[in-house]
Amino acid sequence: YEGRNSYTISEAEIRNYFPELMTDYVGTCYGMYFAEVADFYCRENNDEKEMMKLVYQSLRALCAPALPNELVRSIFELKAIVVNGEYPGVPEERKLEESTRYALNYIAESSVEKLYTFTVSDKVLAELSQIASEYRKRFMDRSFKSLEILKTLC
């Protein structure tokens, strides 16, 4: 309900506790990073459904053993930039694998629910990670504590 200067949640029904992440310290750190990025982008009184769906689907993807955490992180970072309206598109001046270009377009254009339906080669993952990192530094003008922890763990 709405208070004088804030909203109060009086009840919630939790449907997914992500029990797989309870024993996965690295996965939990990724989840904390996703929450920290969402906190960076989300503003009170805005419709942030897409960002919340992105965080939820990303946590589900962390629980899928077939998807490398680095791929989940890269997709999350790129899609967060897309959702926020800052995505500059595929870097045309760079020589990239055709599969990387396809993956970047897929991430930008797909619904959040369909994001985590593919895997990529190690080379494509390296290119996606590099581009996501460059875009993160360009559009997210702060450091994230959970990302610093992840860098020491991985």
Per-region residue spans from a language model:
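Non-catalytic alpha-helical scaffolds and adjoining flexible linkers that form interface surfaces
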Residues: Y1-C154
